[in-house]
Design a protein with these regions (language model features):
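Short helix-initiation/N-cap motifs at beta->coil->alpha
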Residues: 78-89, 177-205
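Periplasmic-binding protein-like
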Residues: 156-165, 271-291
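Ligand-binding "clamshell"
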Residues: 109-121, 136, 226-239
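A conserved helix-loop-strand patch within extracytoplasmic ligand-binding domains
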Residues: 121-170
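Bacterial lipoprotein signal-peptidase II cleavage site
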Residues: 16-33, 39
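A bilobed periplasmic-binding-protein/Venus flytrap-type ligand-binding module shared by bacterial periplasmic
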Residues: 128-140, 247-261
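Alpha-to-beta junction loops
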Residues: 92-102, 146, 169, 192-194, ...
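Short, well-ordered beta-strand elements
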Residues: 45-56, 74-80, 147-148
Length: 292
């Protein structure tokens, strides 16, 4: 009888151990996938950078840095504008992370007029102002009484008038300067020319539709859009080493305090690359000059 009881106890112990072993095996099996999952972290989503720009040359230059930014984990969205007001408005309102279309004097003028606090994050390029003519091949051929079309806004208007004075077409006060600014009303002697100030983005179109003999002072980017070449078509231009070149360098603008953010610094680094400088040099034939 004792042997039977001992045998029963032994068998019970064996089954008990087997049960413990079988219950622990699935636990190990269910833990394994969890460990594997822990090593497979989801890929980070690309960080978006939204930049407003005028089409030529700014948006074209921005297109050149999309791949470089993608390699750094950024997706570049380019919003194209055809005027000088909306890109700053959108930036101030937070729709854009940055814009790239303007120079510092225009940016400063916009801030003063609109109570905004937008700043330059980097200098990228310069677009020489040029004098272009309808049926005129040199400054000396500009006929008496000809119409001269210039941009109307303060900063671009000043620049245009100083270039006209440089070429002897008008006379301005002795203290006329980029810093002080001048308007059509400040012209001391127009030498019989009819100087008309119009919205900057319409100057080129108005020249194309004007009477023969008309000339116009056109912003570099609008000249490009209209098919003009500084090297081939301009009757006169600003020098690339002039005060105008330094003053009117085109900048990447951002909201104050964001110029050193990671994505803005990534954007600036990409734009100030050797590849972009080469693109500018080879593409724009002197109409756009890299300043980095």
């Amino acid at each position: 009888m004792k042997k039977i009881i001992a045998l029963i106890l032994t068998l019970a112990a064996v089954f008990s151990l087997a049960a413990c072993g079988s219950s622990s095996a699935p636990a190990a099996a269910t833990e394994a996938p969890a460990a594997a999952e822990a090593t497979e972290a989801p890929a980070a989503e690309p960080v978006e950078i939204t930049v407003g720009a005028t089409a030529v040359p700014h948006a074209e230059i921005l297109e050149q840095v999309k791949d470089a930014l993608a390699e750094e984990g950024y997706t570049l969205n380019i919003v194209i504008y055809d005027d000088y007001v909306l890109p700053n408005q959108a930036l101030a309102e937070g729709t854009l992370d940055a814009n790239y279309f303007q120079h510092r004097p225009y940016l400063n003028s916009y801030n003063e007029s609109n109570g905004t606090d937008l700043v330059s994050a980097a200098v990228i390029h310069y677009e020489p102002f040029g004098i272009y003519g309808n049926g005129v091949s040199s400054i000396s051929e500009v006929p008496e009484g000809a119409t001269i079309i210039i941009p109307a806004d303060d900063s671009n208007g000043t620049r245009a008038l100083l270039l006209l004075q440089q070429e002897g077409l008008i006379e301005l006060p002795e203290d006329a300067s980029l810093e002080k600014g001048v308007t059509v009303l400040d012209i001391v002697d127009d030498h019989g020319y009819n100087v008309q100030a119009v919205q900057a983005d319409t100057v080129a179109a108005q020249l194309k539709n004007s009477d023969e003999g008309t000339i116009a002072v056109i912003n570099g980017n609008y000249a490009l859009q209209a098919g003009y070449s500084v090297a081939k078509d301009a009757l006169a231009t600003e020098n690339t080493d002039s005060e105008a070149a330094e003053t009117y360098a085109n900048v990447v603008a951002v909201r104050a305090g964001e110029e050193n953010s990671e994505k803005i610094q990534a954007l600036v680094k990409a734009l100030q690359s050797d590849a972009v400088k080469q693109f500018i040099t080879e593409t724009y034939d002197g109409s756009v000059v890299a300043l980095f």
